[in-house]
Swiss-Prot record:
Entry's family note: Belongs to the MukF family.
Main location: cytoplasm
UniProt GO BP: cell division; chromosome condensation; chromosome segregation; DNA replication
UniProt-recorded name of the protein: Chromosome partition protein MukF
Positions of the UniProt region annotated as Leucine-zipper: 208-236
Keywords: Calcium, Cell cycle, Cell division, Chromosome partition, Cytoplasm, DNA condensation
Single GO molecular function: calcium ion binding
GO cellular component, one term: cytoplasm
Annotated SUPFAM superfamilies: MukF C-terminal domain-like (SSF140570), Winged helix' DNA-binding domain (SSF46785)
C-alpha cells in the first residue's frame, strides 16, 4: 500500500540522477541467491569477502566455468553488486583489506522473491490474516473511543498504514506469485504432452490437482477472514464520518477496502480460470486417447494384413437376423419390410389415389360448415378426423384437412395479429395452431 508523494517527472529525474540500474545475468543472479542462502544461516547477517568468494566458487563450478581466474571474476562480481546497491560494503582501519558485506533491502527483496516467496503456506497466510484481524480490531476499538489528532495517528492510522497495509501487500504478492506458478505449470504440462502424452497423463493430473488445491486453500482462507476484516474497516469508516479533519484515515480505509476486495475477487477469478484450463487439458487428453486408439487399431490391422502369409489369421463376424414386427396394427408402418419396396410409379399412384379419395370426402363434409355459416374450429375437426385413421396416416390426413379447410374461408382473428393457441390433435403430441374460421 505504497503512497508516492513525488510526481512521475520527479521520480524519473531522481532515478536518472542516482544512475539506478540492475543487470543480473543468470550466473550473477545465482551468485546473489547463494549469498542470501548462506547469509540466512548466519546469526549476525554479515559475510566476509572470503565467504563471498567461496560462494562464487560454488556458482562457477555449477556453470562449469574456469577456475584459473576465479579470484578476479569474484572480485568483479562483488564490486558490480555493490555498485548496483545489492550489497553494502563496510571497511575499518583496524581490519584493512578485510571488508564486511551485508545485503541491502533491494538485494533482500530480489532474493526473497526467488527463495522464500516461492513456497505457498496456508499456515503462513493464516498467521498473516490473524495478525491483520488483531490489528484491525484494535484500530476499530481505538476509532470508536475517539480522541485527539495524536490518538488517531498513533492508534488508528499507524497500525493501518504500517502493519495492515504491508500484510495486504504481502498477500497480494503471494497471489501474483501463484499467477506465475500457474503459468509455469501450464508450460510444464505442455512440454509433458508434447513428449509422450501417455506417460505424462499421471504427471499432468498431479500438477493440475496440486495447483487447484493450492488455489482453493488460498481462497478459502481469504474468504473465511474477509468478512471480519471488512466489518472492522467499516467500523473505522463509520467513526471517521463525524470528523472533518480525518480525511487521511478515511482515504486509507478506502484503499484497504479496495485492496481486500481486489484480493478476494482475483482469488475467485483465478480459480475459475484454472478450472477452465483444467477442463481444456482433460478434453485434449480424451481427444488424444480417442485418436490414438483408432490409430493403433488401424496400424495393427495394416500390420496383420502385411504379415498374413507369415502369420495367417481368420476373421469371424456375426450378423443378427432382422426382427420384423408382424402385428396387424403396425402393418402400415412396416409395409416396406414385409412386402418389399414398391416401384416409384406404383407408390406415387397409390398415394395420389388415396389422397384424392380423402380430399373428396373431406371437402364434401367440410362444405356443411360453409352452407350453414357455422364457425370451423380446425383443431377439433382435425382431431375428429385423425381418430378415424391409424397413426401412420395422421400427417397426410391432417395436411389434407387443413388444405381443404383454408379453401373455405378465413379467420377474422388472423387480422388482429394475435397468435392462436396450440391445440392437440392426437394422443401422440401433435398440435396445430389456427384461429376459428368464421368468414367464408
Amino acid at each position: 500500500m505504497s503512497e508516492f508523494s513525488q510526481t512521475v517527472p520527479e521520480l524519473v529525474a531522481w532515478a536518472r540522477k542516482n544512475d539506478f540500474s540492475i543487470s543480473l545475468p543468470v550466473d550473477r543472479l545465482s551468485f546473489l541467491l547463494a549469498v542470501a542462502t548462506l547469509n540466512g544461516e548466519r546469526l549476525d547477517g554479515e559475510m566476509s569477502e572470503g565467504e563471498l568468494v567461496d560462494a562464487f566458487r560454488h556458482v562457477s563450478d555449477a556453470f562449469e566455468q574456469t577456475s584459473e581466474t576465479i579470484g578476479v571474476r569474484a572480485n568483479n562480481a562483488i564490486n558490480d553488486m555493490v555498485r548496483q546497491r545489492l550489497l553494502n560494503r563496510f571497511t575499518s582501519e583496524q581490519a584493512e583489506g578485510n571488508a564486511i558485506y551485508r545485503l541491502t533491502p533491494l538485494g533482500i527483496g530480489i532474493t526473497d522473491y526467488y527463495i522464500r516467496q516461492r513456497e505457498f503456506s496456508t499456515l503462513r497466510l493464516s498467521m498473516q490474516l490473524s495478525i491483520v484481524a488483531g490489528e484491525l480490531k484494535r484500530a476499530a476499538d481505538a476509532a470508536a473511543e475517539g480522541g485527539d489528532e495524536f490518538h488517531w495517528h498513533r492508534n488508528v492510522y499507524a497500525p493501518l498504514k504500517y502493519s495492515v497495509a504491508e500484510i495486504f501487500d504481502s498477500i497480494d504478492l503471494t497471489q501474483r506469485i501463484m499467477d506465475e506458478q500457474q503459468q509455469q505449470v501450464k508450460d510444464d504440462i505442455a512440454q509433458l504432452l508434447n513428449k509422450d502424452w501417455r506417460a505424462a497423463i499421471s504427471s499432468c493430473e498431479l500438477l493440475l490437482s496440486e495447483t487447484s488445491g493450492t488455489l482453493r486453500e488460498l481462497q478459502d482462507t481469504l474468504e473465511a477472514a474477509g468478512d471480519k476484516l471488512q466489518a472492522n474497516l467499516l467500523r473505522i469508516q463509520d467513526a471517521t464520518m463525524t470528523h472533518d479533519d480525518l480525511h487521511f484515515v478515511d482515504r486509507l480505509v478506502f484503499d484497504l477496502q479496495s485492496k481486500l476486495d481486489r484480493i478476494i475477487s482475483w482469488g475467485q477469478q483465478s480459480i475459475d480460470l484454472w478450472i477452465g484450463y483444467d477442463r481444456h487439458v482433460h478434453k485434449f487428453i480424451r481427444t488424444a486417447i480417442d485418436m490414438d486408439k483408432n490409430r493403433v487399431f488401424a496400424q495393427r490391422l495394416r500390420q496383420s494384413v502385411q504379415t498374413y502369409f507369415d502369420d495367417p489369421w481368420a476373421l469371424t463376424y456375426t450378423n443378427a437376423d432382422r426382427l420384423l414386427d408382424m402385428r396387424d396394427e403396425e402393418m402400415a408402418l412396416r409395409d416396406d419390410e414385409v412386402t418389399g419396396e414398391l416401384p416409384p410409379d406404383l407408390e406415387y399412384e397409390e398415394f395420389n389415389e388415396i389422397r384424392e379419395q380423402l380430399a373428396a370426402i373431406i371437402e364434401e363434409q367440410l362444405a356443411i360448415y360453409k352452407t350453414r355459416q357455422t364457425p370451423l374450429d380446425l383443431g377439433l375437426v382435425v382431431r375428429e378426423y385423425l381418430a378415424q385413421y391409424p397413426r401412420a396416416r395422421h400427417f397426410d390426413v391432417a395436411r389434407i384437412v387443413i388444405d381443404q379447410a383454408v379453401r373455405l374461408g378465413v379467420a377474422q382473428a388472423d387480422f388482429t395479429g394475435l397468435p392462436a393457441k396450440w391445440q392437440p390433435i392426437n394422443d401422440y403430441g401433435a398440435k396445430v395452431q389456427a384461429h376459428v374460421i368464421d368468414k367464408y
